[in-house]
Amino acid sequence: MSTWIIDTAHTEIGFKVKHLVISTVSGKFTKFEGKLEGDPADLTNAQITFTADIDSITTGNEQRDGHLKSADFFDAANHPKLSFKSTAIVGKGDNEYKVTGDLTIRNTTKPITLNVEFGGVQNDLYGQTVAGFEITGKINRQEYGLSWSAVTEAGGIVVADDVKLIINAELVKKVKEAATA
């Protein structure tokens, strides 16, 4: 079994949510870590773990980012990280998988199923073995205590409950250190 570590320079942990029902706001986490224990070309026996620092959330708008970090949403002061740990992985064929796991946000843990597409393995310019993945899914933010909501004068919802997850990840194979005598 090999260990693969997320390459933070070549990974994006993103999300999209409807704003005012008519447009979409995108954001991402910039500080995170994760690993895969197993074979990236056959995830069915792999174990995947991941964490992200809530304080690293960014949507390109400082005021909105501050609101997301507040107790109205993620409450970063009391819940500084979100985490994911896989519990089951099923192959769908054509390098596609359904990865089920436990997602924890604000001390609330719920099962989530993600769609994972394995992009392949290559050696990079530095001789490292790298695996690529595209991961998508959806959560209902209300289920994790991200419950702030408002309604416009016309009765429109300001922030939708469903949040799309979009992750493009590269993982680097960890080289085993030789035992010293």
Where are these regions (language model features)?
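Low-complexity, acidic/polar, glycine-enriched regions of mature
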Residues: 1-181
